[in-house]
Amino acid sequence: MGFPKEGEKVQIHSYKHNGSIHRMWEETTILKGTQSLVIGANDRTVVTESDGRTWITREPAICYFHANYWFNVIGMLREEGVYYYCNLSSPFAYDSEALKYIDYDLDIKVYPDMTYTLLDEDEYEKHSQIMQYPPVIDTILKRNVAQLTQWIHQRKGPFAPDFVDMWYERYLMYRN
């Protein structure tokens, strides 16, 4: 597995545990790419859902993917401040086609005041039965929910006060 290079434009593909495509982001600019970490940015990019419907993102976003954690984080820049959407997912993989991960349903939405809500627990329970997630997946995801909430409280990693703004400034250099 390689990793995307700085300045490269890539697609992001989200899959379900059973291998079916969940969602695709058409274009994300890579701001940092290493074996263990990818930071990207996009703005008004086309998103295609598994049923073929498409929509366009409304605001600039900074995307954080790590090879050692079972989550990814999207920081969305809005007028009221930065909102974060955190997907509990497999660590990322990258090939010539796209940056890829498996979406495990659970999400955490973080508000500008750093309060947060765990979302889609019902969807997780349903899909864990239908797709037969092994018990180890449940253990890993619970551990990563705890890790993620700790990062939120500590303002660590993508939740650090200047993280999103700093990477957005870098993204602007590629847009002009």
Swiss-Prot record:
For binding Mg(2+) 2, which residues are annotated in this chain's numbering? 105, 107, 120, 123
Q: Does the keyword Cell division apply?
A: no
Q: Where is the active site?
A: 23
Under SUPFAM superfamilies, the record lists: FomD-like
- Needed co-factor(s): Mg(2+)
- Which keywords belong to this entry? Hydrolase, Magnesium, Metal-binding
| Domain of life the protein comes from | Bacteria
Alphabetically, the GO molecular function entries are: magnesium ion binding; nucleoside diphosphate phosphatase activity; ribonucleoside triphosphate phosphatase activity
Binding site residues for Mg(2+) 1: 87, 103, 107
Matching entries from InterPro entries are given as: DUF402 (IPR007295), FomD-like_sf (IPR035930), Ntdp-like (IPR050212), SA1684 (IPR016882)
* One Pfam family recorded for the sequence: DUF402
Give the reactions, separated by semicolons, that this protein catalyses. a ribonucleoside 5'-triphosphate + H2O = a ribonucleoside 5'-diphosphate + phosphate + H(+); a ribonucleoside 5'-diphosphate + H2O = a ribonucleoside 5'-phosphate + phosphate + H(+)
Known EC number: 3.6.1.15, 3.6.1.6
Q: Which NCBIfam families match?
A: PRK13662.1 (NF010183)
Q: What does this protein do?
A: Has nucleoside phosphatase activity towards nucleoside triphosphates and nucleoside diphosphates.
What HAMAP family does the record point to? Ntdp
PANTHER family, alphabetized = PTHR39159, UPF0374 PROTEIN YGAC
Q: Which family does it belong to?
A: Belongs to the Ntdp family.
- In Swiss-Prot or TrEMBL terms, this protein is called Nucleoside triphosphate/diphosphate phosphatase
